[in-house]
């Protein structure tokens, strides 16, 4: 069975508190008739601070999709390479040991993919398999883990480098006055992570036993982008907040088939931080105590929703916690489609 090793997570230098973001929105849209409601909804996100690739004052003046794409590529190249080198070292491997590289990102576009940059910059083997994932949004990190696991199961030498990179602030639309635009502007944060999935049993971490994918039919409108001249405009249907009830039975079945116990008896969880409501729904439908998802809540509070990076940030927090060898855990993330990707396994660190 393959093992997720200690990730390396990086944040851009610019930081913004939630109060600063509220003040910014109030100044920008002083006469908005629903600003009081927006402020209450932003307070309910339970996000305290986030990191941004540019200061909020620069983001408040939309300089065009071209300029934002230049910033995206510049920061992506620099931060991804640094994170990747540290992740490979964390896994106890050499660069030449990597046989596949996966990059997840839904907040910018590059062609060739960032996978090509990493092969060149790190001097990965020329036979390295590339898998860029661009349109799975927040679920992409977990999807990358599961696709890496599929590849690793073919050969005990098939070690995989996964790099997740999200600069959601570059999708901020200061002229968008829709209520959900205000909420997303205060919810999503910027971050980069790199993590190695080792195909052998020679490292400690989250050893994957079984994975599962789930697609909710006729839910494409739940989470989507409207692509306009100014770039990506994020839209969210409130129906997504009730989607966990559909995927919870799938998680329970996966868990029981793997360990003959319900999720409530697991020792740890690595959940995507879609927002406070999503975490509350997981607690309710999996019959968990609220503190069982404390690592995800901490990630949400300290970094915001960092999309495909979330599962790796929460995984890193589990490495810093007091888990014991043999503890059983569930990893799950959710995104456009509506899509869920899940993995269950044991702690071996």
Curated annotation (Swiss-Prot):
Effect of residue 181 to S: 2.5-fold improvement in thermostability. Shows 110% of wild type specific activity
GO cellular component assignments: type III polyketide synthase complex
Acyltransferase in keyword set: yes
One MF term in the entry's GO annotations: acyltransferase activity, transferring groups other than amino-acyl groups
Effect of residue 210 to L: 2-fold increase in catalytic efficiency
Effect of residue 21 to T: No change in activity toward lauroyl-CoA. 3.8-fold improvement in thermostability. Shows 90% of wild type specific activity
Stretches of the chain forming a coiled coil according to its record: none
PANTHER family for this protein: 1,3,6,8-TETRAHYDROXYNAPHTHALENE SYNTHASE, HYDROXYMETHYLGLUTARYL-COA SYNTHASE
Protein name listed in UniProt: Phloroglucinol synthase
Organism annotation: Pseudomonas fluorescens (strain ATCC BAA-477 / NRRL B-23932 / Pf-5)
Chain's gene name: phlD
């Amino acid at each position: 069975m393959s093992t997720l090793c200690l990730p390396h997570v990086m944040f851009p230098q610019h930081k913004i508190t939630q109060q600063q973001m509220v003040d910014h929105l109030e100044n920008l849209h002083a006469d908005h008739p629903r600003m009081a409601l927006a402020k209450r909804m932003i307070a309910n996100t339970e996000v305290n601070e986030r990191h941004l690739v540019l200061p909020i004052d620069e983001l408040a003046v939309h300089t065009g999709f071209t300029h934002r794409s230049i910033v995206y590529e510049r920061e992506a190249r620099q931060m991804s390479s640094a994170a990747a080198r540290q992740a490979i070292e964390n896994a106890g491997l050499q660069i030449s040991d990597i046989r596949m590289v996966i990059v997840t990102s839904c907040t910018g576009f590059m062609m060739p993919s960032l996978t090509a940059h990493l092969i060149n910059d790190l001097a990965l083997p020329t036979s390295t398999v590339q898998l860029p994932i661009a349109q799975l949004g927040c679920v992409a990190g977990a999807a990358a883990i599961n696709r890496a696991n599929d590849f690793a199961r073919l050969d005990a030498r098939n070690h995989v480098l996964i790099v997740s990179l999200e600069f959601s602030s570059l999708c901020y639309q200061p002229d968008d006055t829709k209520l959900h635009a205000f909420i997303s502007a205060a919810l999503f944060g910027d971050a980069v992570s790199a993590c190695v999935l080792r195909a052998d049993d020679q490292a400690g971490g989250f050893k994957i036993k079984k994975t599962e994918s789930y697609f909710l039919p006729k839910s494409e409108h739940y989470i989507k982008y409207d692509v306009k001249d100014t770039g990506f405009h994020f839209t969210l249907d409130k129906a997504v907040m009730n989607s966990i009830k559909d995927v919870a039975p799938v998680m329970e079945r996966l868990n029981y088939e793997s360990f003959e116990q319900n999720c409530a008896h697991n020792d740890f969880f690595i959940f995507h931080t879609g927002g406070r409501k999503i975490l509350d729904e997981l607690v309710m439908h999996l019959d968990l105590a609220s503190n069982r998802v404390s690592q995800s809540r901490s990630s949400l509070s300290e970094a915001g929703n960092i999309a495909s990076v979330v599962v790796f940030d929460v995984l890193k927090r589990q490495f810093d916690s007091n888990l014991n060898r043999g503890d059983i855990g569930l990893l799950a993330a959710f995104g456009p489609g509506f899509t869920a990707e899940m993995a269950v396994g044991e702690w071996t660190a």
